[in-house]
């Protein structure tokens, strides 16, 4: 799949907004703290290479989820450090050394599997992942982390960092967060030698628990202008959303009362209505269950009526508008703005409660051209 430039559906990325958010984060955290930009998942849908290139002078390194994302940045000419946050396949060792990419080590069995294959770890740089309560990957006991560090160093690898990830930093209650923090601190305190880089702060932790920062932070959703909590917690400073998602009206018609829209005929007009078609759908990341979400036309909120199709939606207009009229799904239209957070909440009445604010930009597919 590649971008489709010959249709009106576009993602407009304000790289200046991302840089501004980074600068504000820098003013919020202790001086000297390293800033790592999380550009996994195509930079949360904003375009990994374009974003990383624009901000390379503002950050100390990049975080990605896998070796292919890391290599993409290297092949684009990015020279800053790159950390893979997930577990890599054993075969990625050679590529990691070739492209100077830092791997995450999360278990003794992974190290042993490498040693069983007689892999050469000389020149490999790694960070140890601690599972302090997220429950995904990582060492849960200090002894295991220490053993891993010893094994890696014995076989030529450089253990540069150690990190964890908080599960509830964006929630009102601090109880579980504090329990995780104490667990992580206890593991660090029990180690004979703590690696140089210690990081536990994702965006939420950095925003609302700045006093817990070690010596590096990982900037994800906040870098793109997204509130990690949705609207649960107030931000300590304003964030500027970087993504605008736009399309245009390609078909407009007036229908009579009783007319149905979309698969399953889930919407039926209760009066004469103006219905328009917009060329965006679930193949673009605007998912099927976003029926009833709102878009902006001429500064007015217009609901999506009928189920979202693969590459089209139907919306209800207040009046007839010309073909080509701009439709804003995320961003500003006239004197109105609709954000990813507001889109998330517009589906609340339909029990769309599991949608996190950063999922929406992440889902914008590669076929939507980015500018």
Model-derived regions, located:
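Active-site anion/phosphate-binding pocket segments in diverse small-molecule metabolic enzymes
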Residues: 2-15, 19, 69, 88-90, ...
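Active-site-proximal beta-alpha core segment in soluble small-molecule metabolic enzymes
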Residues: 2-5, 9-13, 17-20, 33-199
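Conserved PLP-enzyme active-site core in the AAT-like
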Residues: 28
């Amino acid at each position: 799949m590649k971008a489709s430039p010959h249709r009106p559906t576009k993602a407009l990325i304000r790289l200046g907004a991302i840089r501004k958010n980074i600068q504000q984060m820098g003013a919020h955290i202790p001086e000297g703290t390293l800033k790592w930009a999380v550009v996994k998942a195509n930079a949360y849908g904003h375009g990994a290479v374009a974003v990383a290139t624009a901000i390379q002078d503002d950050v100390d390194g990049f975080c990605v989820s896998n070796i292919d994302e890391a290599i993409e940045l290297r092949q684009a000419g990015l020279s800053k450090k790159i950390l893979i946050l997930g577990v890599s396949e054993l075969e990625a060792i050679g590529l990691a050394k070739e492209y100077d990419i830092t791997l995450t080590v999360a278990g003794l069995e992974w190290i042993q599997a490498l040693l069983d294959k007689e892999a050469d770890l000389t020149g490999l740089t790694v960070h140890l992942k601690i599972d302090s309560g997220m429950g995904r990957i990582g060492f849960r006991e200090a002894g295991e982390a220490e053993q891993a560090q010893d094994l890696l160093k014995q076989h030529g690898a450089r253990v540069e960092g150690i990190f964890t990830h908080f599960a509830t930093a964006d929630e009102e209650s601090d109880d579980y967060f504090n329990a995780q923090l104490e667990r992580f601190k206890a593991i660090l305190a029990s180690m004979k030698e703590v690696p140089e880089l210690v990081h536990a702060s994702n965006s939420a932790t950095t925003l609302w628990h700045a006093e817990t920062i070690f010596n590096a932070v990982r900037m994800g959703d906040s870098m793109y202008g997204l509130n990690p909590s949705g609207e649960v917690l107030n931000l300590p400073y304003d964030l500027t959303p970087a993504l605008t998602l736009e399309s245009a009206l390609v078909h407009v018609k007036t229908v009579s009362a009783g007319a149905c829209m979309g698969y399953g005929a889930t919407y039926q007009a209760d009066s004469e209505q103006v219905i328009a078609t917009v060329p965006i759908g679930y193949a673009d990341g605007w998912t099927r269950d976003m029926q009833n979400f709102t878009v902006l036309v001429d500064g007015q909120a217009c609901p999506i009526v009928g189920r979202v199709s693969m590459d089209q939606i139907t919306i209800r207009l207040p009046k007839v508008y010309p073909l080509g009229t701009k439709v804003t799904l995320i961003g500003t239209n006239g004197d109105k703005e609709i954000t990813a957070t507001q889109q998330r909440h517009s589906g609340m009445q339909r029990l769309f409660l599991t949608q996190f604010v950063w999922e929406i930009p992440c889902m914008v597919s590669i076929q939507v051209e980015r500018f």
